[in-house]
Each structure stands twice: as C-alpha cells, then as structure tokens.
C-alpha cells in the first residue's frame, strides 16, 4: 500500500476535505450521507461496498449528480479502496474490532490502523469533531429512542433550536452546515457507534445496560465496556446523566473534569431528579430557588410503563441542565405522542386496544412492556433468537399475560419456557396476519383487553427489520378493523 497523505483531525474544519482523497466504507444510510457531505465539500470520494451496483441501485441514485469512485461487489479487494487515502470514513457496522465485519475488510482496516498513518473515523465521530453546537448523547441497551425523542421534545420547549439524529435513523453529518453554537443536538448512540468514538458529547445520558449484541462483542463484559465509553469521553464541564435504578449504570463514575446528575424512581437528592408523592420531582440544586421541585404528575405522562417514567426523568434532567423552565418541560412531556414501534398505540375497537412494540427484541424490554398494562393482555411474540435467557421473561409473562400467540423461529423455545412458568394458553401462528387474528379472538373473550406485539426476538426470520414487522402488525390490525366495520 502506498504511503498516503492524511487529514489532521485536530482542529478540523469544513474546508479540510477539499481536493483530498477520502474513502467511505459502506453505502447504507450513513454511507450515503457521508458520501454526499464529503463530495459537497470538495473531497475526492471512493466508496467501497461488498454489494453490487444492482443491489445498491437505490443508494447510488440517492447520491444525485455526485460521481464518487465506486468499488462495489464481492470481487473487489478492499485494500484497493484504502490505498492512498487522506481519511477513511466508516459506516456504523464496519470496524476492525467487529467479527461481523467482512473478513477481508476487517483485515485491511486493521493493517491501516496498525500503520497509524491514515485516520479512520466513523460518521458520528466525524460529526462530533465538526459540530459547533452543544451535544447530548443518549445510550443504553433499551429506551434510547424514546429517551432521545423525549429529550428533543423537552429541549424544543426552550429557546434554542434542536436537532435530533444518530442511530434513530437520521445521519447528522449533512446537517452540519446549518448548525451554530446556539443549537442543541440530541444523538441516539448505539453499541455500533460507541467503540469508534474518539470525541464525546457534552452530556452523556444512560438509560440502562443489560446484554445485547453479544455476537459482535463476544461477552457481556466487553459489551458493557463499550457502553460506558460515552461516559469516559465526557469533556471538561461535561455531565453524566445516570440512571441509578440500573445496577450497571449506577456504578459508573465520571472523569474528574466532568460531573454527574442522577435520576431514579425514588425521592431525589439535591442534584438529581426522582419521584415523590405521585410527581416527577427535581432536587433543590436542579431548579430555581423559588421552585418547589414539582415538575409533572405521574398521571400526566402519556406513555405507559415504569420504564417510561425513567425515560421522562432522564429528559427532565437534561431539560433542567439546559435551563428549560419546569412548566415548559411538563407541557412538552404531556404533549409527547411516543415513538413508532415502541409501545405505539395503533388502534382501539370492539373493546380491544392494539399496541405495537416491535422494537421489543430483548427479554428485558418485553418484561417492561407486559408490566405496563393492567387489564386482560394477549401477547404476540417470537422471531429469531438473540441467544439471551428467557426464564425471567417467562415468569413475567405467566404472571401478567392471559394468553400468548407465538410465531417465528423461537416458537418452540418460548412455548416450552412459558408453559414451564405456568402459562396455560399458548397458540401458534404462521404469519403476522394469523397472529393478529388469533390474538383478537382471544382478546374479545374478555374486554376491555389489549393485544401487544412485543416479540422478545429479532425480526430477520420473517421480516427485513423490526420496522417492517411493526408495519405488518399495523396492517394486520387495520384488516381486522375493516372486518369489524363490515360486520356491523
């Protein structure tokens, strides 16, 4: 490999890319945004992806009239894409550390990193190095998207303009030209994005940390180490917003240069947010001297479940840190409509409410979901196993759920676990349409009732992703609603 020039990441500005050779690895959502941004700022971009041009037709079309050098397909040697570059930019799923990265690319990247001549930077890391605005990073195993969205809503009730993005599906790199020091940027950050960070956010918010993606990180300890990276990277004056109800997160400490604000579903201390007497409460150090600390009644939180109380606590803490008035925070939370595929209320008819929690791919998330509902509950679950234990899930389901309809590859595993835990009514379905139909029949036996899709499994055995699974659920519910209208 030829000795490449390099871009100095220290003091990086938007003009640093002009006439510089830059490689982009991966042409999915993040890679498309990187390619457009770099090309628009004068870089000579090379794009590498193992998929063919035919497979990437929509992605290539999304580049518009930009004409990067495209090295596409399984026959391309990734070393060719990395040769003579000033900078290498990676998509979230690409890293020399990940066993899930294509082996040849992983090896070629490792060689570049070992040589130390050319910076390798992710889209999020590049954004944070260039961003002039205050930043809030949100991470955890579950609850990231809802908490990020709540924080954006709460900050939006203040005076500063707010931008939301990151793992929530909106790459932020293309938003850089419009950002100023007066903006607030909220980034949802996944375990894919954290290991490659070398620049932290001004505030690091943690929901909770259990276990997930062990195929990529190898062990629970390695996964947890990745998750705490956002706290480790806090800058001078940075703030860790820490969930003290979580046994892992509550043990996190901050560097001497930063400070911490905690939240928990219990009475708050001076520099924390908590719950007391049916209210979201802020400690004395979090609110003006003439304020009694009461922010919002728990009964006014529009999204169900104790875990969503925790999410509101985190958002409240961030809002107060940025000077949003307590009354404005309360109004923002009361008006929060929730997030698609996360305990999303889809419809209510014939005495049955339908809830889409397709993003509930992990047992812990489903436990929280079933505990969010009091009345007659029918659960739709199943999919591709994530290799996580289901005993605690089975106990919660047997305690809180009247019946389960199972589908997908984990049907037999979940049926055995639920039966052993004492659940008597277990049905099976071969499609989402059949699952919703069967669940509806059971739910109508005792109304009011709730049908909850919360799979406790990945979607890839039957769907492209959890979003496609959620859309299929909503379509099936719409079909049942239409049948109900016709029968009247």
What are the roles of these predicted feature ranges?
Residues 197-200, 230-236, 253-256, 372-374, ...:
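Short, conserved loop/helix-junction motifs that constitute active-site signature segments
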Residues 43-51, 241-244, 378-381, 400-410:
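Short internal beta-strands
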Residues 46-49, 71-74, 119-125, 165, ...:
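Beta-strand->loop->alpha-helix junctions that form or flank phosphate-binding loops
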Residues 1-122, 304, 483:
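N-terminal leader/targeting and accessory segments in enzymes
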Residues 38, 88, 138, 167, ...:
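Residue-level signal for inorganic ion chemistry
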Residues 66-67, 391-449, 487-488:
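C-terminal helical cap/extension that packs against the catalytic core
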Residues 39, 79-85, 92, 96-244, ...:
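Phosphate-binding loop of NTP-binding sites
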Residues 5-21, 33-41, 295-402, 416-419:
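Nucleotide phosphate-binding/pyrophosphate-handling subdomain across enzymes
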